């Protein structure tokens, strides 16, 4: 089983700071789930591609505990920058 959950193509209008800074790399990301591994355990699949280089990025195959850790880290980072978190 493979199923796409969400994706976000980079939009330079949403973040012109990243778009205009040659030292920053704009990326697109996608989240999916898959269970076609040798152990048949479902994993969260995070793909990050540099703009203009589709298929050349990194793909993380995360067990549920790893995905929860990233979720907690994102929540904490949002809190640190003053964003409301659920």
Spans of features found by a protein language model:
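Positively charged, low-complexity terminal tracts
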Residues: 1-86
């Amino acid at each position: 089983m493979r199923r796409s959950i969400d994706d976000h193509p980079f939009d330079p209008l949403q973040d012109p700071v990243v778009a205009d800074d040659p030292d920053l790399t704009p990326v697109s990301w996608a989240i999916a789930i898959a269970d076609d591994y040798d152990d048949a355990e479902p994993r969260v699949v995070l793909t990050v591609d540099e703009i203009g280089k589709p298929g050349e990025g990194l793909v993380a195959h995360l067990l549920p505990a790893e995905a929860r850790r990233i979720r907690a880290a994102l929540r904490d980072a949002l809190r640190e920058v003053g964003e409301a978190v659920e």
